[in-house]
């Protein structure tokens, strides 16, 4: 297929300008290349339903980068160890790794084929700050190498908030940030997650709402700070988290 690089690039640049985000020309080119790789590979491997250039630029890349507007991240170290839980086709982790080369990323997913694509493409693009982890979040959260090991844990379109927080909390360090990318349903999910926040030692720091350009929807970014060590019983076993959420 022919990917319209110019349309993708111009749409992304306009969106970044509206959001007050500055990205280098080198980073923009890497994002164009990553988007093109997705569009081409998606013909044989189901990576994402978003392959139209303008839609991909806004709903995947720009949406991923909106966390950079948050002052909450200013409290974290300059060189971050980050995890993207349920990365799918690499969002938000890959765009953030491109724009922030001093942030080291682990992209976690349970689908090996997607991770293979991400790893191969990241190597082709020279993204030395990206690695992948094939695992369930419930299992990774109990492994010493990953438990409370990350300054920043992000997740987009993975699960309802009470479930998502239990998956993320074991992975983020005390004082670190969990960032949940949500849509217009964020207020309802926040109300249902009060017990989860208490149980998991997560305090809501900020809710950032925005409308995407070209009427492509509303987004909410929910930022939580880890206020204390997590009880050993969390996360619960795979399946239990979803069947009996902390609500």
Language-model region placement:
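Conserved beta-strand signature within the Rossmann-like core of class I S-adenosyl-L-methionine
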Residues: 175-185
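Helix-to-beta-strand junctions that scaffold the AdoMet/dcAdoMet cofactor pocket
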Residues: 100, 172-174
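Short alpha-helix immediately C-terminal to the canonical SAM-binding loop
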Residues: 114-116, 186, 190
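Residue-level signal for inorganic ion chemistry
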Residues: 38, 96, 182, 224
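SAM/dcSAM-binding transferase cores
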Residues: 191-247
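Conserved SAM/SAH cofactor-binding pocket of Class I
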Residues: 65-166
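Short "lid" loop at the C-terminus of a central beta-strand within the Rossmann-like core
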Residues: 138, 160, 183-187, 212
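Class I SAM-dependent transferase core
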Residues: 1-79, 83, 113-130
